[in-house]
Amino acid sequence: MIEPILLGIVLGMVLVTLAGLFVAAYRQYQRGNKMGL
């Protein structure tokens, strides 16, 4: 049985990681568009 607190921490870390990757990809995409790619 998984500890609810541990499960919450893991889910939170996963969400933050996915959000960070999405933001980084979005910013890189915007920078590429501004350069005329």
Swiss-Prot record:
Topology with respect to the bilayer: Single-pass membrane protein
Disulfide bonds: none
NCBIfam families, per the entry: PRK00665.1 (NF001907)
Key words of the record: Electron transport, Membrane, Photosynthesis, Thylakoid, Transmembrane, Transmembrane helix, Transport
Organism field: Synechococcus sp. (strain JA-3-3Ab) (Cyanobacteria bacterium Yellowstone A-Prime)
Pfam families from the UniProt entry: PetG
Predominant cellular place of this UniProt entry's protein: membrane
Keyword Membrane (UniProt): yes
Function: Component of the cytochrome b6-f complex, which mediates electron transfer between photosystem II (PSII) and photosystem I (PSI), cyclic electron flow around PSI, and state transitions. PetG is required for either the stability or assembly of the cytochrome b6-f complex.
Protein name stated in the entry: Cytochrome b6-f complex subunit 5
InterPro entries xref list: Cyt_6/f_cplx_su5, Cyt_6/f_cplx_su5_sf
Subunit structure: The 4 large subunits of the cytochrome b6-f complex are cytochrome b6, subunit IV (17 kDa polypeptide, PetD), cytochrome f and the Rieske protein, while the 4 small subunits are PetG, PetL, PetM and PetN. The complex functions as a dimer.
Transmembrane segments: 5-25
Subcellular compartments: Cellular thylakoid membrane
A GO MF term: electron transporter, transferring electrons within cytochrome b6/f complex of photosystem II activity
A single cellular component GO annotation: plasma membrane-derived thylakoid membrane
GO biological process, one term: cytochrome complex assembly
